[in-house]
């Protein structure tokens, strides 16, 4: 007999049939379906945060505060940062502040505060500034532009 495509078959025992669990006693894996005795572990899973009947953490700890989603977050920098990093007559932009490592994040808004002294005329472009910082810059002949 020659071996032909229609004559081929698997060796007996090479392919096992899939057990369909929980489909009656006659199927061999009925009733408890290989999960042992009845109880919590037989069922699906316990919900997230469940502590076995003990009062869970999110109910033990009191509610406190809230998060203001309208809050504007600024990365702050001071006049002392500008004094040490810029020359007379330079233009200070958010990009140059980031490149000179004054600002840690590129896309966050920035606010200029008045800590330190300024001895140079600078043109500063920023998102926000304090009134004291504005006065110190304008005293030296500089300008502040709001982005």
Swiss-Prot record:
Q: What GO molecular function annotations does the UniProt record carry, in alphabetical order?
A: rRNA binding; structural constituent of ribosome
Give the superkingdom in one word.
Answer: Bacteria
User: How far does the signal peptide extend, from start to end residue?
Assistant: none
Q: Name one GO biological process term.
A: translation
Q: Where is this region: Disordered?
A: 1-46
Q: Does the keyword Ribonucleoprotein apply?
A: yes
Bias-annotated ranges (Basic residues): 16-28
Keywords carried by this UniProt record = Ribonucleoprotein, Ribosomal protein, RNA-binding, rRNA-binding
Short name of one Pfam family: Ribosomal_L27A
Q: Which InterPro entries match?
A: Ribosomal_uL15 (IPR030878), Ribosomal_uL15/eL18 (IPR021131), Ribosomal_uL15/eL18_sf (IPR036227), Ribosomal_uL15_bac-type (IPR005749), Ribosomal_uL15_CS (IPR001196)
User: What GO terms fall under cellular component here?
Assistant: cytosolic large ribosomal subunit
Family membership noted in the UniProt record: Belongs to the universal ribosomal protein uL15 family.
How does this polypeptide assemble, per the annotation? Part of the 50S ribosomal subunit.
* Protein task: Binds to the 23S rRNA.
The protein's name? Large ribosomal subunit protein uL15
């Amino acid at each position: 007999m020659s071996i032909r495509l229609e004559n081929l078959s698997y060796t007996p025992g090479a392919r096992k049939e899939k057990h369909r669990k929980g489909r009656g006693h006659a199927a061999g894996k009925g009733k408890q379906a290989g999960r042992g005795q009845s109880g919590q572990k037989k069922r699906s899973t316990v919900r997230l945060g469940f502590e076995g009947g003990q009062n869970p953490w999110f109910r033990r700890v009191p509610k406190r505060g809230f998060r203001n989603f309208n809050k504007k977050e600024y990365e702050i920098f001071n006049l002392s940062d500008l004094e040490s990093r810029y020359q007379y007559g330079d233009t200070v932009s958010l990009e140059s502040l980031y490149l000179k490592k004054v600002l840690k994040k590129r896309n966050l808004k920035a606010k200029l505060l008045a800590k330190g002294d300024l001895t140079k005329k600078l043109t500063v472009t920023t998102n926000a500034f304090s009134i004291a910082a504005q006065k110190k810059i304008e005293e030296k002949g500089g300008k502040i532009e709001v982005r």
